[in-house]
Regions:
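N-terminal regions of ATP-driven nucleic-acid and macromolecular assemblies
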Residues: 1-175
Length: 175
């Protein structure tokens, strides 16, 4: 299926939240495909957690590329259809409704979990995803500075939409 995750900040702990799944998938020999990540993940921490990096693929194009959006969408669609892929994560901003539907169909045709990570400013512009989540960092104190990917943090996870699930459920997680 396809899940849309809205992020309050680019490094709000989304990858850390998914780490147990990433470890499991990589150890099962499944591919983890990251498309257009906002920064290079701390792969040394991934290895420490147990991720097998030979099963991780990062796809990133130069920002000067004229067809960058088309290339990212094509790469994500192929990842969703690829049966050897366990999870495909795509960081993007605005996405046309028709393209979101096409990605949902690609996700349903394969066995890959597809995650689209977008800034929370797009909350009023939902994609055709099976589920929507909002991730917000809970600051520890007024002097709060945005954390590194693996600094201790607390997250508020809001379940906005899901098939058969009640809407607007909130969970507090400490990572």
């Amino acid at each position: 299926g396809l899940v849309e995750i809205l992020l309050s900040t680019p490094s709000c702990g989304a990858l850390r939240l998914m780490m147990p799944l990433l470890v499991k998938l990589s150890q099962e020999g499944k591919w983890i495909i990251l498309i257009n990540p906002p920064h290079t993940p701390l792969f040394s921490e991934w290895v420490r957690e147990g991720v097998i990096l030979s099963n991780v693929l990062v796809i990133d194009f130069p920002e000067t590329d004229e067809d960058i959006e088309k290339k990212y969408l094509w790469a994500y669609e192929q990842a969703l259809k690829f049966h050897g892929c366990g999870i495909a994560l795509f960081w993007c901003d605005e996405l046309a409704i028709g393209k979101g539907r096409r990605l949902k169909l690609s996700a349903e045709s394969g066995e890959t979990l597809g995650l689209i990570l977008r800034p929370s400013i797009y909350r009023r512009h939902p994609l055709a995803a099976s589920s929507r989540l909002q991730l917000d960092i809970i600051p520890k104190d007024p002097e709060y500075i945005e954390p590194r990917e693996y600094a201790p943090l607390s997250l508020k996870v809001t379940h906005i939409k899901g098939n058969g699930a009640p809407n607007k459920q909130e969970y507090i997680l400490t990572l």
